[in-house]
From Swiss-Prot:
Biological role stated in the UniProt entry: Involved in iron-sulfur (Fe-S) cluster assembly. May act as a regulator of Fe-S biogenesis.
Leader sequence residues: none
Organism annotation: Shigella flexneri
Protein name, as recorded: Iron-sulfur cluster assembly protein CyaY
Protein family (similarity comment): Belongs to the frataxin family.
Superkingdom, taxonomy of origin: Bacteria
GO CC annotations on file: cytosol
Any single biological process term in GO: iron-sulfur cluster assembly
Alphabetized HAMAP family for the sequence: CyaY
SUPFAM superfamilies linked to this entry: Frataxin/Nqo15-like
Length: 106
């Protein structure tokens, strides 16, 4: 994968997250902001999830209250380089815990 393809795929990931949060019907207030290639999800309780791209490594990094995760693209899925879990699984787990209600991105 070259740098431009990586940025296209990361942009697509950011857009999907933003659209899913805009479309959700949950009770808690969840805000999403993109600034300089960093996506920040802020929850009603003040906690945050930070998602950024690491261009030199062609990775997406996810920082949550539970820890930090690094994802490589394998096929059409972003996969954690330590646990083998998908980006969507870990994001949903963290968002659900931090929101105090089920948050789905799929």
């Amino acid at each position: 994968m070259n740098d431009s393809e990586f940025h296209r795929l990361a942009d697509q990931l950011w857009l999907t997250i933003e659209e899913r949060l805009d479309d959700r019907d949950g009770d808690s207030d969840i805000d999403c902001e993109i600034n300089g290639g960093v996506l920040t999800i802020t929850f009603e309780n003040g906690s945050k999830i930070i998602i950024n791209r690491q261009e030199p490594l062609h990775q997406v990094w996810l920082a949550t209250k539970q820890g930090g995760y690094h994802f490589d693209l394998k096929g059409d899925e972003w996969i954690c380089d330590r646990s083998g879990e998908t980006f969507w699984d870990l994001l949903e787990q963290a968002a659900t815990q931090q929101a105090g209600e089920t948050v789905s991105f799929r």
